[in-house]
Structures are given as structure tokens and as C-alpha cells.
Amino acid sequence: SKLEDGSRNFFFKVNGVRIFCKGGNWVPTDSLYLRTPKESYETLVREGAAAHFTMFRMWGGGTYEPDCFYEYCSEYGILLMHDFMYACAFYPDHKNDFLFEAEREAEYQTKRLAHYPCMAIWTGNNEIAESYTDWFPAPIKPERFYGEKIFNYIQPRAVHRNSPLVPYMPSSPYFGDRANESEQGDVHAWSFFGRHPKTKFKFVYELEAFDRIPARFSSEYGFFGAPVSYTHLRAHETEADL
């Protein structure tokens, strides 16, 4: 919905009631995800509900989860903002064999997940629209948006055909002239919260910075997490070196 200053709201309504979305991004539970037992999925979803989460964002650099995950999210009342599994890259939509596989994937997953109450929205990918508008200077910017046929045609048609009550947007973040704008749509707030101005990839850890994010809907942000102490100890001789 458009506001008086020209910006736009971004929010979810359930049964006509506007809700507050609190949650986090869901990434694969294990680097070998097939070894994650069903009980672990329930534990993780239950812990999210206990923390008053109302939504997980299914990160497009991960994987589609097994049926039990969607069953637990529906049972515990956690909605899903669900990326299709494409992330941070351009995809060869000029190749018919690739488009065929993309269409099969979209058809299968939208049919498989259509009946789960937890499905709040499908999003086409993780950060690919933003990458095209923001990540590449003119000399190396691709001549066109590779993947457009997938995100603007194949996926939305599959969603509308197989799950017509679930909305679709082509990417996350999305909306606005540059995809990741704080005045419109959802935002991935990585560059705002304290990146050191003179060192491109050095982060300044300021918790207070999260209070200053001017986003309509922050669908991804956070801090880099440290590994467990055992991992550190494998790389250091003694605990005193930590």
C-alpha cells in the first residue's frame, strides 16, 4: 500500500488481520542435510515457536525441506516466506534444457507444498534482482538479466496454477528501482548496520545498529556467528590462545 511520502508498506495479513512477523532465516540444518532426523526438525520449529517466532524465511541458497518440516510449521503456527532455491547468481535461461528442469522443479514443489497452511508467500530467489541492479559496475554488468524467464514467467505461472491463494514475488529483496530499497518492499540489511567505511568486508559489531534499520520489512540481516569452541581448539594449541 502506498504512503503519503511515496514509499510503500510491506506486511502480511492472515484472515484479513494484519500481523507482526518476527522470526529468522531458515538454512540447512546440516551440511549433510539428509542425516537430520525428523525429531530435530520438530525441536527447531518448536524452539522457534517458543521464542514467539511467527515466520521463517526459507533462504534460497539452501534446500527444499522434507514434508515433516512443513507439517511442524503448520502445527506450531509459523508461516513461511519461501524462496525457490536460486541464489546470488545468474542462471542460463537461454538454454532450453535448463528451462525444462526449472519448470519441472517449480511444478513439483508448488504442488507438493500447496496444501500446507504455513505457506505465506513464494519468492523467486535470493538476492538475484538486487545483484543485477547493484552488484556489478557498468563494464562487467551482464547485457541482460539472466534468469528472468524463470523468475518472471515459469515460477509465477506454477504458483498461480498450483497454489493460487499464495502470493508470489520475483525475488527477495524486491520492489523499488533498485530491489533493495528501504522505502519499498523487503530489505536485506547487511550493508547498513556498521560495515567499516574504509574496508569493504570488515564489519563493526554494533547491536544498536539494528534499531536504526529504516526498512519496511527486514527479511534478512544479522551477525556472523562464531563456531563452537571445539572448532577453535582444533586450530589453536591451547585454550589460552583463544
Language-model segment annotations:
Residues 1-89, 99-121:
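Active-site-adjacent substrate/metal-binding segments within catalytic domains
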Residues 99-105, 112-177:
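Active-site neighborhood of glycoside hydrolase catalytic domains
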Residues 218-222:
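Short acidic/histidine-rich active-site segments
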Residues 62-63, 86-88, 126-130, 175-176, ...:
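Solvent-exposed loop/turn segments at secondary-structure junctions
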